Design a protein with these regions (language model features):
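Short proline/glycine- and basic residue-enriched helix-capping loop/turn segments at helix->loop/beta transitions
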Residues: 1-18
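Cyclic nucleotide-binding regulatory domains
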Residues: 13-14, 18-81
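Conserved active-site beta-strand element of glycosyltransferases/polysaccharide synthases
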Residues: 86
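A small-molecule sensor/coupling module
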Residues: 73, 92-121
Length: 121
């Protein structure tokens, strides 16, 4: 399913416990988990406040930072077991967003605004 992307971007093999990105990092790359398992976690005041959000093989993660142009990552992504990922560079994601149909882009941003506001209420 991801063979074409793997040919273009390659893949990385990661050991269990490898940090893919850390909360507050400024990079905007996206990732596809080819196989393995990744846990998302986040901290507040140096205490873990959320854990147990898992990414499974075939899922995309880390793209919201680029999609919604946020300043920093809200989560830390760490492999739970040996895993393989494809990294999609920020510039590729940005180009896809720029080329996206304007109506679909509007819908996506409206959905995000609605989701974000409902979680703060």
């Amino acid at each position: 399913m991801f063979a074409e992307l793997e040919k273009i971007f390659g893949k990385q093999k990661l050991v269990a416990g490898a940090m893919i990105y850390q909360q507050n990092d400024a990079d905007h790359n996206g990732y596809i988990l080819l196989n393995g398992k990744v846990e998302l976690s986040r901290r507040h005041n140096n205490k873990v406040i959320e854990r147990g959000v898992f990414i499974s093989s075939g899922q995309v993660f880390g793209v919201f930072t680029s999609l919604f142009n946020t300043k920093a990552r809200r989560w830390t992504a760490t492999t739970v077991i040996a895993s393989e990922i494809i990294t999609i560079p920020e510039k590729v994601i940005d180009k896809k967003i720029e080329d996206m149909d304007p109506f679909l882009r509007y819908c996506l941003f409206q959905w995000y605004a609605l989701e974000h506001s409902s979680k703060q209420n």
